[in-house]
Amino acid sequence: MDAEIFSLDSLSIYKDINIASAKPSLKERKNIKHYALDHLNIDEKNNAQLFKTLLEDAMRVSSKEILLIVGGSSFYLKSILEGLSDTPKISGEEVVKIEREISALANPYAFLKSIDPTIAFKIHPNDTYRIHKALEIFYLTHMPPSEYFKANPKKPFEHAISLFALHIEKNALHNNIKQRTKNMLHSGLVEEIKALYAKYPKDSQPFKAIGVKESVLFLEKQLTLKELEGAITFNPIKLAKRQNTFNKTQFNILYTGSVKEVRHAILKHSKSAY
């Protein structure tokens, strides 16, 4: 397949996280152009707006007929496709100040409910990501988020994107995850995270990711090596199940099948589109 790849992955976007993200090696990237890899430092934040900007840049410069958007950040993909509101540009110092304000809240959801019942009603109390994003808007603009979004409506994504999903039999998927965990540990996952955890702020976004957060717990002696391997195996299995449900219910997927079948479907679809 003559294509380029856009990585919609919230861990591969970071420099220096290579093992935990199972990022393609430089050798694997040599003949195939990849976008949105190694873009951020560990102490920088990723979000849907950043991925949208990078995706639009990639679409503009890609020389291939096919640009494959690959990765597991389905929530970001949904946000991009449905449209995003413009958010004000802020400095690193302002980000730190806002993070401190939010961290100081005893109950972020209760506070959001008190300043903006309308937006709080639309967010589940356990949806920490969306609660956090709403509070960021409030502290940044001093407006209730619902009013801000009314004044700054979502801008739909201007490009047509066809969605394909891989189907992997449950036992095969679980075995793949178990083997990947062993490979990561053997390749130096703990050493990779140890070096980064010593260098960057402990509340950096990547340290909350699956595979990374468990390694941090091991480094803090809260997990044994056996428990670490079990956690890095079990948590991705749970995540894969959630992602599968999310993808089925939130997207209009054109085709689902094996790697070979999806490859054939993409080629067939791309030919009919031109």
From Swiss-Prot:
Quaternary structure, from the entry: Monomer.
Site positions per UniProt: Interaction with substrate tRNA: S73
Name of the gene: miaA
EC number assigned by the record: 2.5.1.75
BP terms from Gene Ontology: tRNA modification
Ranges where the record places region Interaction with substrate tRNA: 9-12
Upper classification of the organism: Bacteria, Pseudomonadati, Campylobacterota, Epsilonproteobacteria, Campylobacterales
Highest taxon above the source species: Bacteria
Family: Belongs to the IPP transferase family.
Listed GO MF terms: ATP binding; tRNA dimethylallyltransferase activity
InterPro entries given in the database record: Dimethylallyltransferase (IPR039657), IPT (IPR018022), P-loop_NTPase (IPR027417)
Catalytic reactions of this protein: adenosine(37) in tRNA + dimethylallyl diphosphate = N(6)-dimethylallyladenosine(37) in tRNA + diphosphate
Protein role: Catalyzes the transfer of a dimethylallyl group onto the adenine at position 37 in tRNAs that read codons beginning with uridine, leading to the formation of N6-(dimethylallyl)adenosine (i(6)A).
Known cofactor(s): Mg(2+)
Keywords, sorted A to Z: ATP-binding, Magnesium, Nucleotide-binding, Transferase, tRNA processing
UniProt-recorded name of the protein: tRNA dimethylallyltransferase
